[in-house]
Swiss-Prot record:
Disulfide bonds: none annotated. It comes from Bacillus licheniformis (strain ATCC 14580 / DSM 13 / JCM 2505 / CCUG 7422 / NBRC 12200 / NCIMB 9375 / NCTC 10341 / NRRL NRS-1264 / Gibson 46). Signal peptide: none annotated. This is UPF0178 protein BLi02714/BL03680. Belongs to the UPF0178 family.
Amino acid sequence: MEGWRISLLEKERTIFVDADACPVKDEVLKTAADFDVKVVFVASFEHFQITRKEEENWTYVDPHKEAADLYIANHVRPGDVVVTQDIGLASLLLGKKVYVMSERGYLFEENSIDHALFRRHVAQKLRRSGRYTKGPKKLVKEDRERFVKELQKILSKIEGFTY
């Protein structure tokens, strides 16, 4: 994503979180607060809770499996940050000049997204044929630390600082 940087004066920066199964919501909130960046959690109505924290901004969408993805895709602008584990959504957003990162702190990039999509496709084919494929490993402390560090790096880059 080198070569383009958008001034904060142009628009309010937003972090969108594909929130239904996101394990790093607290880390997103804390890091965003450090940089004074707006966070929008997008989740299905099936995950609605009345007891959300006041500082959290939640948007609820239909329970359709792609509804949160479509909401995010339709509301992001160049320079925004999206946190998702959905490789298909990441692929769509990269063309919109959006920073897309996984919950483990890995940045999706245009030069490697095709390989990630291919791996996902192969795993789906194996599952459909009855073969077992391992799911993701449990998120550990090091994953959370990597996530925070990478999010800080992205937000610093957007603001024109080095971290």
